[in-house]
Swiss-Prot record:
GO BP: any one term: phosphoenolpyruvate-dependent sugar phosphotransferase system
Active site positions, chain numbering: H83 (tele-phosphohistidine intermediate)
InterPro entries: Dup_hybrid_motif, PTS_EIIA_1_perm, PTS_EIIA_component
Protein name: PTS system glucose-specific EIIA component
PROSITE patterns: PTS_EIIA_TYPE_1, PTS_EIIA_TYPE_1_HIS
Subcellular locations according to the entry: Cytoplasm
Organism: Borreliella burgdorferi (strain ATCC 35210 / DSM 4680 / CIP 102532 / B31)
Sequence positions that bind Zn(2+): H68, H83
Pfam family name, one: PTS_EIIA_1
Function statement: The phosphoenolpyruvate-dependent sugar phosphotransferase system (sugar PTS), a major carbohydrate active transport system, catalyzes the phosphorylation of incoming sugar substrates concomitantly with their translocation across the cell membrane. The enzyme II complex composed of PtsG and Crr is involved in glucose transport.
Subunit structure: Heterodimer with glycerol kinase (glpk).
GO cellular component, one term: cytosol
Length: 189
């Protein structure tokens, strides 16, 4: 650490679940671009609700014209990408209703896109929803919250944690997260 590094401010950003459901490791996503963290590091959620919410305050950078994904830029310079399902681009927007618009500032928990979850379950390859930090190479650390255990404690791991079978088993025992309420990612920049 150099002398000037002492004066650099670090920012911590807590991201809430943008959709209710079961949190899983990003490497379980059935799409190589997400599973290999090419798009960015983060988590995935197997959804149970019908709305995609803003995981934090920020400015909507992009909403795909098919309304299946959006990006959010925070004042701290963190770029978040929320992508509903796998190959849902092929649905040409069917099952998705845009609520917010590109370029607007949103607050944590605001609805960005409404979903017809039953239709999407029937017509998409997968509804697993990756939530990633697109510029994860520019952040100092990422912690993942996989939900709460039976004793109501949060199960949080860092990006340096090796996902052993024991840890994967513990993750599988967590309760589903609630959109707009439960922490899913903590990012330090």
């Amino acid at each position: 650490m150099g002398f000037l590094d002492f004066f650099k401010k670090t920012a911590t950003l807590d991201l809430i679940a943008p959709i209710s459901g079961k949190v899983m490791s990003i490497d379980k996503v059935p799409d190589e671009a997400f599973a290999e963290k090419i798009v960015g590091d983060g988590i995935a959620i197997l959804p149970t609700s019908n709305e995609l919410l803003a995981p934090c305050d920020g400015k909507i950078g992009k909403i795909f014209k098919t309304n299946h994904a959006f990006s959010l830029e925070t004042k701290e310079g963190v770029e978040i990408f929320v992508h509903f399902g796998i190959n849902t681009l092929n649905l040409n927007g069917k099952g998705f209703t845009r609520v917010a618009e590109e370029g607007i500032n949103v607050k944590q928990g605001e609805v960005i896109i409404r979903l017809d979850l039953e239709y999407l379950k029937e017509h998409s390859e997968s509804v697993i929803t990756p939530v990633v930090i697109a510029n994860s190479d520019e952040v100092s650390s990422i912690e993942y919250s996989f939900g709460r255990l039976e004793n109501d404690s949060e199960y949080i791991l860092s990006s340096s944690t090796v996902l052993t079978e024991e840890i994967r088993h513990k993750i599988s025992q967590t309760k589903p997260v609630i959109a707009g309420k439960d922490l899913v990612l903590r990012v330090k920049k």
